[in-house]
Structures are given as structure tokens and as C-alpha cells.
């Protein structure tokens, strides 16, 4: 047999392995949903099942790809080179082992979900620090370990036999006519293998933005369905990824006395009993004559600064017409540039719910976040000023555990896509209009109450599925005027159309709220920028800046300088200074925007009067010391608690 024959034969067996494991994971996924189907919420449709299987299939391409790659490297490649290489036997052992392991993991998952209402999660890490004997006894007496494990092994052996039979099926003989034909067929195979490899790497997509991965897999209005999307390898990888992040960021290499020195450097009270209390602020003047009953903060998905800037004035006049109208109002103030907490939505949410600077640790996965309140978090600051706090999310509360995290951090109520009409919803949740409509209904049902509404939108995000024509978007009104950084392509117009939609629905919502409560106060900002597809490289402000708009009766423009800047979590103390009364106190790590800092920073960028910069290693040493102090205090607060 020549090498081409051996290679194509091995490749066919690899393809059969690919098909086998894709079917196996899909079967396990379906069986898992069926097993717990009684837990599905009312209104779950067959289409939700199919979406789960589809997203799961795409995500499992990563796992399937790794298994098949092991067979390709261990069997197909050496078998092509060496005639007597035992490739068939090696491939069989790889596939048999993988089939057996994933069958046993599936049985374990069934019991695990019964206990934790989740597939494998961070409780695995916590369990490693637990009483192993107690865990073993619990498994035996409560969850049938002694009969479930043998059953899993028996079923695994049966499925493994099916695997061998399936992969052992006959293969087709491929030949070539001459050397030219060999080169042609080899090139075609190389291209096909490369495309399949990319699709496996990115979960059925050609790039990361459109991929399905464990971090964005929670796309359905059911915890069960969202957990079913993850196969067991991806669920375990989730645990590994989160733990790796924690370990890399949780090394505290300073003492409690050094912590106090850092607090002192930032102007905190080292004699306070807690870190939060060390950064207590007293409101020195009442800024708004009438305290608003309704306070609304809109954290807009990918709501970026660039359409507000002079350089992009022509497209921005239409794309963010509503946001610009708020800025133009005499009852508003705004920053020239605001630095986002991070480059994703969850870092932004973490920042606002904790009031701490970004430290590459996800507080929403930390035990401290579920034991005690962060006094510097936006919900607790607003509660201390007398407001009921409500979190609104256009997506699903199971995403990043945002429901549990927000409720643990001072929000009185939480509403997500599952609580709202599913009009035009997609994998990420309901359209912004449906979200805002639900909030308006809530406001009408609770007249006169002092309520702080924290709103996290979703529509300005792939897959960009809003019916823009029905929503009223007119692409002819987007004036690019030969702008070289933005191309008028269908995809670009679709992106900008969703940008317009997010801004438009927000503006309509603001007007509707004013009709309910004319004295309402609004804060409009973005979770991050850095998502829009520019045709060419752009400056840092264009790429990464977000707006921060404060709008409501009694606000004065002169309260913020035209060239003011800040970092996202400074919105928290600024809001407290606006709605609070003279003499009231609140806790905040950073000062408000009314007390300008010499510089501002986020996870990557920094800004001062000289400009906006990318690399923090180039900042002055005095700045570095302050940044280090903020980060170390935040790290201590998240990992070791509040006590001083």
C-alpha cells in the first residue's frame, strides 16, 4: 500500500470518529434534558430543545476535535509514514477510552446536577478542600454510588463496543492517476482539514466573535438548557479556566500593615474597622433641590463613545441621536471620555456591583461575594440613600451567575428575559424594546416609590437579529462622507443599525419614564466599546472610550468640565453625590467625578491632562504607586474580606 492510500484510509477512520463523538455528545445532551425535563420552565418549546442541541453540537466540536486530533496524530500520521505502525489499534484505544470516560462522566453529571443544579462547576474546586470521607459516604448513602458506578461502567462498555463497530466500518479506496492528480487531491485535503480545524477551534465559526464557548453558551431562558449545552469536557474546562484566572490573580504578597499603608496613600481612614468604612464619604452639599424618586442607570451593551465625537459627527448625528439629545439638554452633564471597567460585559457588571477596580479576578465567582456585601457596590450605596434596588437584564440570569450575584450584592429584585415578553428574542435575550417595556410596566405598577433601576441591555450584540426595517432604521441617513475608517458594507450597516436601535429605544424609554416621573434621574453609559468593526486602525479614544451622561431636572452642565474624564466605577459616587442630601454618607473606593483625579485608569488604559495612553508601564511612578494601591486593596477586599 502506498502512503496516499494509508493516509486517506486513516482519514476516513478519523472522520468516522468525528461523526461518532458528535452523535454521542448529542445523544447524551438530549438524554440529559429529557431526564430533567420536569424542571423546564413553562413556555419551553421544541425549538428551545433544538437550539440547545445546535449550540451544544457547535460547542462540542471543540471536544470532538481534540479527541479526533489525538487519533490523527497517534495513528493516521505515523501510519502514513510507517507501513507497520499499529494505527488501527491505537485509534481504537483512544476512541474506546474517550467513550468510556465520557459515559461515566455523563452518569456523574446526572447526580451532580441533582445536587448543584449545574453541570461541573467551581464546587469541584471547593470540594477538594472538603471532607473527602464525608463526600464518599454521602455519595454511597444518598446518591447510589455503589450501584450507579457499576451501571455506568457496564453501559460504557456497551457503548464502547458500538464505537468500535461504527469506526470499524469499511472504508473507500482512493487512488490517484499521476503526480499532478496526487498534488491536486493532497491540496484539497489540506484545505478541508484546515477548515474543519478552524471550525472545531471556534465552535462552528470561523472566528472567536461568532464562536460558541463556555463563557457565552448561556443563551436560553432555562438553566437546564444552558447547562445542557456544555458537554462534560467543556464544563470541566470551565472549572479549569475560572480557577486558573483566580490563581493567577489571587496572590496577595503584602501584610495587613502594608494594606493600611496603601489605604493611607489613597486618603482612606486607617483607623476604620473595615476597608469599606475606610473610604466613607460625607455629602457636603445637596446638589438636586428635589431628590428624585426614580433613578435609572442604563448600562448599554457596546454603547461606545465614538459616535458622539466630532470626528464621527456625520454618522453619529443619526446613530446616537437620542444620546446626543440628552447631552444637548440644559439638564445634563457628561464626561469627555470615560474608561470602561474592562473589555467585556461581566467585568463592567462586577465593577458596578462591587465598586472595586478591575483585578483580573471575577468577584461573581468568589465566596466572599456571597458571604458579605460590598459597601462600595452601587446597590448598597443606593440602598444607604433610601432607594429600593432593582436589577434588569435583557439576557438570562444564569449567565455568569449574574442573578445570584446581584441579589447577593444588595439588589432587592432581579428580572431577566425569562420575566419579559419573548418578542423577537434571540440567543442572548429579548430586544431592548421588550426590556424597556417591561420596566415601564413595573414603574406604572409602583408609583411614588423610591427605586433605583440598574438596566443591562443586550441588543447591540451579535447575532444582530433585530428587524431594523420594522424598528425604523433608515441606512440612507447614516452619512459617512467618504470616511476611510468606516465602509458602507451590509455587515457594517447592520452593526450600525443595531447601534442606532439601542440608542433609539433608550431615548424612547427615557421620554416614557419622564411621562411617569418628570423628576427622574438618568445615567447612560456603556459596558465596553472595542466591538465595532472599523475598516482601519483608530485611536484609543475611538476604539475604547465609552460615554457617561447624567440627565435629569436640576443637573447643571458646569458641574463637569468639558474635558472631564474618569473611570466607570466613579459613576457610583457621582450618583450618590447627586441624589444624596447634605450630611448623608456613602462608601466609595474612588472619588466622584466632582473631585477630579490627576489621572484615571482601568485594566489597561490611563488618561491625564496630557492624553490617553495604552501602556500603563509607561505611566509616571507616582501614578503606578496609586494604581497598585487601588488594585491591592481591591484584591484584598475580594479574597480576604472587609475587616481591617
Describe these PLM feature segments.
Residues 6, 10, 124, 131-134, ...:
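Exposed alpha-helical structural elements
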Residues 24, 129-133, 230-233, 256, ...:
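Alpha-helix initiation and N-capping motif
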Residues 267-644:
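Solvent-exposed soluble domains appended to multi-pass membrane proteins
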Residues 73, 132-139, 237, 259-266, ...:
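Generic structural signal of hydrophobic/aromatic residues within well-ordered alpha-helices
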Amino acid at each position: 500500500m502506498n502512503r496516499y492510500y494509508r493516509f486517506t484510509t486513516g482519514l476516513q477512520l478519523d472522520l468516522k470518529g468525528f461523526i461518532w463523538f458528535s452523535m454521542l455528545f448529542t445523544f447524551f445532551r438530549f438524554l440529559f434534558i429529557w431526564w430533567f425535563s420536569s424542571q423546564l420552565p413553562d413556555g419551553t418549546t421544541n425549538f428551545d430543545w433544538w437550539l440547545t442541541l445546535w449550540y451544544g453540537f457547535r460547542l462540542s466540536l471543540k471536544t470532538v476535535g481534540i479527541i479526533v486530533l489525538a487519533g490523527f496524530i497517534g495513528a493516521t500520521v505515523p501510519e502514513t509514514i510507517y507501513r507497520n505502525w499499529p494505527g488501527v489499534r491505537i485509534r481504537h484505544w483512544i476512541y474506546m477510552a474517550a467513550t468510556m470516560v465520557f459515559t461515566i462522566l455523563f452518569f456523574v453529571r446526572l447526580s451532580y446536577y441533582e445536587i448543584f443544579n449545574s453541570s461541573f462547576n467551581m464546587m469541584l474546586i471547593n470540594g477538594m478542600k472538603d471532607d473527602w470521607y464525608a463526600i464518599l459516604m454521602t455519595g454511597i448513602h444518598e446518591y447510589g454510588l455503589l450501584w450507579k458506578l457499576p451501571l455506568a461502567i457496564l453501559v460504557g462498555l456497551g457503548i464502547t463496543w458500538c464505537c468500535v463497530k461504527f469506526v470499524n466500518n469499511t472504508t473507500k479506496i482512493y487512488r490517484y492517476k499521476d503526480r499532478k492528480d496526487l498534488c491536486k487531491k493532497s491540496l484539497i485535503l489540506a484545505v478541508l482539514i484546515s477548515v474543519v480545524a478552524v471550525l472545531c477551534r471556534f465552535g462552528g465559526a470561523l472566528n472567536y466573535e461568532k464562536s460558541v464557548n463556555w463563557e457565552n453558551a448561556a443563551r436560553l431562558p432555562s438553566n437546564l438548557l444552558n447547562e445542557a449545552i456544555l458537554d462534560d469536557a467543556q464544563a470541566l474546562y470551565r472549572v479549569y479556566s475560572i480557577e486558573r484566572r483566580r490563581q493567577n490573580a489571587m496572590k496577595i504578597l503584602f501584610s495587613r500593615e502594608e494594606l493600611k499603608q496603601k489605604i493611607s496613600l489613597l486618603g482612606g481612614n486607617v483607623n476604620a474597622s473595615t476597608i469599606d468604612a475606610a473610604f466613607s464619604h460625607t455629602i457636603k452639599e445637596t446638589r438636586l433641590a428635589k431628590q428624585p424618586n426614580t433613578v435609572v442607570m442604563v448600562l448599554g451593551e457596546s454603547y461606545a463613545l465614538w459616535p458622539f465625537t466630532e470626528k464621527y459627527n456625520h454618522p453619529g448625528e443619526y446613530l446616537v441621536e437620542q444620546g446626543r439629545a440628552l447631552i444637548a439638554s440644559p439638564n445634563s452633564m457628561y464626561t469627555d471620555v470615560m474608561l470602561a471597567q474592562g473589555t467585556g460585559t461581566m467585568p463592567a457588571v462586577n465593577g458596578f456591583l462591587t465598586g472595586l477596580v478591575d483585578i483580573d479576578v471575577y468577584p461573581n465567582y468568589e465566596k466572599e461575594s456571597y458571604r458579605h456585601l460590598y459597601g462600595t457596590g452601587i446597590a448598597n450605596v443606593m440602598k444607604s440613600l433610601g432607594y429600593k434596588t432593582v436589577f434588569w437584564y435583557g439576557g438570562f440570569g444564569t449567565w455568569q451567575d449574574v442573578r445570584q450575584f446581584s441579589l447577593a450584592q444588595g439588589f432587592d429584585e432581579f428580572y431577566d428575559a425569562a420575566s419579559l415578553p419573548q418578542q423577537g428574542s434571540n440567543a442572548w435575550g429579548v430586544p431592548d424594546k421588550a426590556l424597556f417595556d417591561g420596566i415601564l410596566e413595573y414603574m406604572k405598577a409602583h408609583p411614588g416609590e423610591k427605586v433605583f433601576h440598574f438596566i443591562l441591555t443586550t441588543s447591540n450584540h451579535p447575532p444582530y437579529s433585530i428587524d431594523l426595517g420594522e424598528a425604523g432604521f433608515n441606512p440612507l441617513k447614516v452619512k459617512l462622507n467618504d470616511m476611510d475608517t468606516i465602509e458602507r458594507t451590509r455587515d457594517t450597516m447592520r452593526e450600525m443599525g443595531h447601534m442606532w436601535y439601542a440608542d433609539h429605544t433608550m431615548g424612547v424609554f427615557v421620554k416614557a419614564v419622564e411621562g411617569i416621573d418628570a423628576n427622574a434621574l438618568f445615567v447612560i453609559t456603556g459596558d465596553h466599546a472595542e466591538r465595532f468593526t472599523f475598516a482601519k486602525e483608530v485611536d484609543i479614544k475611538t476604539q475604547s472610550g465609552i460615554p457617561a451622561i447624567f440627565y435629569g431636572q436640576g443637573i447643571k452642565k458646569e458641574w463637569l468640565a468639558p474635558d472631564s474624564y474618569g473611570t466607570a466605577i466613579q459613576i457610583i459616587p457621582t450618583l450618590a453625590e447627586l441624589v444624596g442630601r447634605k450630611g448623608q454618607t456613602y462608601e466609595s473606593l474612588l472619588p466622584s467625578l466632582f473631585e477630579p483625579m490627576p489621572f484615571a485608569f482601568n485594566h489597561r488604559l490611563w488618561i491625564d491632562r496630557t492624553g490617553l495612553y495604552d501602556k500603563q508601564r509607561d505611566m509616571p511612578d507616582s501614578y503606578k504607586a496609586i494604581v497598585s494601591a487601588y488594585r491591592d486593596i481591591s484584591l484584598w477586599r475580594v479574597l480576604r474580606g472587609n475587616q481591617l
